[in-house]
């Protein structure tokens, strides 16, 4: 290692001209950062806006969820149109008793046919398969972070 060299007096003089300006600027920045630290809350949760009205974001392309919603709405509209088209016609009324005709007008159908093996629109075919999942255990004792903290999230 070489010996430390002191600055030349000329360089020191040149620096001294702007020191008062620099010192003032540094002091202002320091006070500003201190205020910012004081204002910052200690909570880790993301900052909530004061106004409850939703913010408007301008984006060129709609988000995937919006596209999906739009597609779902279009499907619903097409289904509604199909349902409207299926009105009771004169051909349907042929060979029916008055009671059956009355029932058709009230309920929208005349007979109690089975739908087994037929495709049915709507939520009629919304069934779920019983999926057995492996049980997830939560560790209560001997945890790394100690006891006084929330349990680990298990989805």
UniProtKB/Swiss-Prot annotation:
Predominant localisation class: nucleus
Source organism, top-level taxon: Eukaryota
Record-level GO BP terms: mRNA processing; RNA splicing
Keyword Phosphoprotein included in the entry's annotation: yes
Phosphoprotein as UniProt keyword: yes
UniProt entry keywords in alphabetical sequence: mRNA processing, mRNA splicing, Nucleus, Phosphoprotein
UniProt region (Disordered), positions on chain: 1-96
Location(s), subcellular: Nucleus
Residues carrying Phosphoserine: 61, 65, 111, 114, 132
InterPro entries (alphabetical): SNRNP27
GO cellular component: U4/U6 x U5 tri-snRNP complex
Biased composition range(s): Basic and acidic residues: 66-96
Annotated Basic residues bias: 1-31, 39-59
Pfam (any one): SNRNP27
Family note: Belongs to the SNUT3 family.
Primary role: May play a role in mRNA splicing.
Quaternary assembly: Part of a tri-snRNP complex.
Protein's UniProt name: U4/U6.U5 small nuclear ribonucleoprotein 27 kDa protein
Organism: Mus musculus
């Amino acid at each position: 290692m070489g010996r430390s060299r002191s600055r030349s007096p000329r360089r020191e003089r040149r620096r001294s001209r702007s020191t008062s300006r620099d010192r003032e600027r540094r002091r202002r920045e320091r006070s500003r950062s201190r205020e910012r630290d004081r204002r910052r809350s200690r909570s880790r949760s993301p900052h909530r806006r004061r106004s409850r009205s939703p913010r408007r974001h301008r984006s060129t392309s709609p988000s995937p969820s919006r596209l999906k919603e739009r597609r779902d709405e279009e499907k619903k509209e097409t289904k509604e149109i199909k349902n409207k088209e299926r009105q009771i016609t004169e051909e349907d009324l042929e060979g029916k008793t008055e009671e059956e005709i009355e029932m058709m007008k009230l309920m929208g159908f005349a007979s109690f046919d089975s739908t087994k093996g037929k495709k049915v629109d709507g939520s009629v075919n919304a069934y779920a398969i019983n999926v057995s999942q492996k049980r997830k255990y939560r560790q209560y004792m001997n945890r790394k972070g100690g006891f006084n903290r929330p349990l680990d999230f298990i989805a």
